């Protein structure tokens, strides 16, 4: 929050108030770091994502990550509202600089780690590191410009259509 406040030349308290207002208006949502059980984890700041991915300018990687964040957020809210699950979406960043974009937690258990790349299909080392240490049910690297999906070292490297395609096909799960 202090970095954002510094760039905007406002106080951190004002930045937090603005962010809270934007969240209440459904312009942005925040994803907080996972720190439970991770002694070297960074506990602040949250990542901020736009509900409307058209608001993301420039960096294709940031746009891809924001799009996946929106899809995961929608899926989490659907699971909570329609099926009664307690779902939380977090990210992981530690003091050594390792980061995984998303950690899907359902009923207080880590279910999936998700890393997003625009075109790099080489396995993300922090994803491997945390998949080995935290042992989620699934570890996924979503690559937007992926030529061919593959699995290696208990990690799936897939396209966004493969990850979210069933959600986009009405009637497929009936």
Predicted regions and their residues:
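Conserved beta-strand termini and adjacent loop/short-helix elements that scaffold enzyme active sites
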Residues: 31, 92-94, 142-144, 158-160
